[in-house]
Curated annotation (Swiss-Prot):
Keywords recorded for this protein, A-Z: Amino-acid biosynthesis, Arginine biosynthesis, ATP-binding, Cytoplasm, Ligase, Nucleotide-binding
Oligomer and partners: Homotetramer.
CDD domains noted in UniProt: ASS
One GO CC term on file: cytoplasm
Stated name of the protein: Argininosuccinate synthase
Enzyme class (EC, first level): ligase
Entry binding sites for L-aspartate: T117, N121, D122
Subcellular location: Cytoplasm
InterPro entries found in the cross-reference section: Arginosuc_syn_C (IPR048268), Arginosuc_syn_N (IPR048267), Arginosuc_synth (IPR001518), Arginosuc_synth_CS (IPR018223), Arginosuc_synth_type_1_subfam (IPR023434), AS_cat/multimer_dom_body (IPR024074), Rossmann-like_a/b/a_fold (IPR014729)
Alphabetical list of SUPFAM superfamilies matching this protein: Adenine nucleotide alpha hydrolases-like, Argininosuccinate synthetase, C-terminal domain
């Protein structure tokens, strides 16, 4: 009787490479690597998995699907965990889990493995998502089971013919996709240490950024960014392009001590140039086009959605319901913003929309004023009536 098939979420790094060598004794390992826009050498990763002992190796380009179905709902909801983190890694885990489950069904695998430790959020995100999509699949976490130190991993790798990555001395743990880059470990673990320049990878230091500001126009249609400077492109390409444009101006650096799902605090360095520009630009179009009641209520749901996504509940009914509400609000979010990029700052300096609720004739203090000021007297009387009655009854 042959071995059971196992789908491994493969990154090409030391942990998941050692996992292939460890798992192949009991399973037929099928390595699956998802391209979510991190810019890795995917051909090398594909071949490396086979060299170590995977029976099959797949590279899945999911950039467009990731952008359209995961990043876009988060953008439209201004999803920022603890009002600071645009959910870079948290957004990619659901689509990775989804594709792992699809590959398990396609290949007849009964088990999925991931390379997460027992200390981070991602183990929860993967396993909760997989259980939501197919509760019959078994999930194992080799790295969590080993509890090995890095030196023990290297010893095992050398003994089992696993190639040692060239950047093994890099003290940082980095995760990247088209929505941004996350960095932790090394000197960053001490929150009193300023992050050294070497900790950043996709943004220039604001001090080294160009001395001249750059202005860009971003066009939105139904809440979706569709063009930069009138050049239309897919959402994935637009985000990747904006990462380069804004990154060279030092935009999107975030230094955050966050509350992890597993109960500890963690210091993270994020670089999210496109995300920070798009979040600011999108909010400005909403400010023009949404009625006051929606503008005031939507942030309550935005905060809840941010927590749901961070806390591994992308596939929960609550997440689905909030995303549906947000999508309904986006029908009028059409227009263009002009954004000034300069030394770490992205400032929206102009905006217009065919759905704008801003009426200059109502807002102006010039002779063109069309606001009926006589109506204010009755409005004030009725608006303040409950307060007035309370004061009369309760003496203030």
């Amino acid at each position: 009787m042959g071995k059971e098939k196992l789908i491994l979420a493969y990154s090409g790094g030391l942990d998941t490479s050692v996992a292939i060598a460890w798992l192949k004794k009991d399973y037929d390992v099928i390595a699956v690597c998802m391209d979510v826009g991190e810019g890795k050498d995917l051909d090398f990763i594909h071949d490396k998995a086979l060299t170590i002992g995977a029976i099959e190796s797949y590279i899945l380009d999911v950039k467009d699907e990731f952008a359209e179905h995961f990043v876009l709902p988060a953008l439209q909801a201004h999803a920022m965990y603890e009002q600071k983190y645009p959910l870079v890694s948290a957004l990619s885990r659901p689509i990775i889990a989804q594709k792992l489950v699809e590959m398990a069904h396609q290949t007849g695998a009964t088990t999925i493995a991931h390379g997460c430790t027992g200390k981070g959020n991602d183990q929860v995100r993967f396993e909760v998502a997989i259980a939501a999509l197919d509760p019959e699949l078994k999930v194992i976490a080799p790295v969590r089971e080993w509890k090995w130190h890095r030196e023990e991993e290297i010893t095992f790798a050398k003994a089992n013919g696993v190639p040692i990555p060239a950047d093994l001395d890099n003290p940082y743990s980095i995760d990247q996709n088209l929505w941004g880059r996350a960095n932790e470990c090394g000197v960053l673990e001490n929150p009193w240490n300023q992050a050294p320049e070497e900790a950043f990878g996709i943004t220039k230091s604001p001090e080294e950024a160009p001395d001249c500001a750059e202005y860009i126009d971003i066009t939105f249609q139904n809440g979706k960014p569709i063009a930069i400077n009138n050049q239309e492109m897919t959402l994935a390409d637009l985000i990747l392009s904006l990462n380069e444009i804004a990154g060279k101006h030092g935009i999107g650096r975030i230094d955050h001590v966050e509350n992890r799902l597993v109960g500890i605090k963690s210091r993270e360095i994020y670089e999210c140039p496109a995300a920070m520009v798009l979040l600011a630009a999108h909010k400005e179009i909403e400010d023009l086009t949404l009625v006051r009641e929606v503008s005031h209520f939507k942030p309550i749901l935005e905060n809840e959605l941010s927590n749901l996504i961070y806390n591994a509940l992308w596939f929960s009914p609550a997440t689905k319901a909030i995303i549906a509400y947000v999508k309904e609000t986006q029908k009028v979010v059409n227009g263009t913003t002009k954004v000034k990029l300069y030394k770490g700052s992205a400032q929206v300096v102009a905006r217009h929309s065919s759905n704008s609720l801003y009426d200059e004739n109502l807002a102006t203090y010039t002779a063109a004023d069309s606001f009926d000021q006589d109506a204010a007297v009755g409005f004030i009387k009725l608006w303040g009536l409950p307060t007035q009655v309370n004061a009369q009854v309760n003496k203030g």
